[in-house]
Amino acid sequence: MKESSLKAKTAKGLFWGGVGNGLQQLFNLFFGIFLARLLDASDYGMIGMLAIFSAISSVIQEGGFGAALINKEKITQEDCNAVFWFSLSAGFCLYILLFLSAPFIAGFYGIPELAPLSRFMFLGFLIGCTGTVHGAIFTKRLMIKEKIHINLIALFCSGCIGLAMAYCGMAYWAIATQQVSYMLLMVSMLWYKSPWKPTLQFSAAPLKEMLPFSIKIAFTNIFNQINQNILTVLMGKYYTSRQVGYYTQGNKWMMMGSSLVTSMVTNVAQPVLIQVSSEVERQKNVFRKMLRFVSFISFPAMLGQIGRAHV
């Protein structure tokens, strides 16, 4: 019974993950095409220059503790409170630091407009830190369908806001507001739908317990974000914002296909593998099945791309 229940949850999670990520990519495609017609490449370039600061700050404030919560067999109110207050405190401190550093960031790129833009954009990760625990709980409980609904609503509403502002000539502020409003809407709905709410109690003991696992995740994610964004920083320093915009947009469209498969699997893999962590052979079997599933989707897609390529 337990085996069939896990299979059903996994299949349901993969199904909704696939449907949700597919719709998400369609929304991104729709809004991306219309925004590209209303905005200049330099607007995207200015947003891209700031991406590394938001991305690394988001990783640091989360500290790998979101993944650590998912990794625990059972989580308590004390665990969730510890991660929530750590994430909120770290996020607030990082925002203050980046707020004060905004003129230096603008000076590094030689674009004064980046100072007020960065201070507004960095609100996104500050808002995001209040939803770290709620998102982890949704993933741990394999509430993929509910999470997808929230994500799609936030994506659609924020996309409409971005389009309206771009139509009114707000340039790069349209993209920045789209990103911040997306985070605000998503976190608000996570709070509304989540069965967990924080309390004022705090203990550092759960953080110490999870630290050996979370620190590895945090460092991995930091290096991953540096690897993904360092070229944009260098281009922003030595090239124009328009050229950076062409690069960031091209890279974004290139990554859409691969992110469709990876996001679908990663949202399900960790919580499922944790449920069978006490049974090594069963865990290996689950991993093999997920690997076959990814191969079943990825290999035909890659062969199709090879067939379409011009010789």
Describe each region flagged by the PLM:
Residues 59-77, 139-140, 250, 254-298:
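Helix-loop junctions and terminal segments of transmembrane helices
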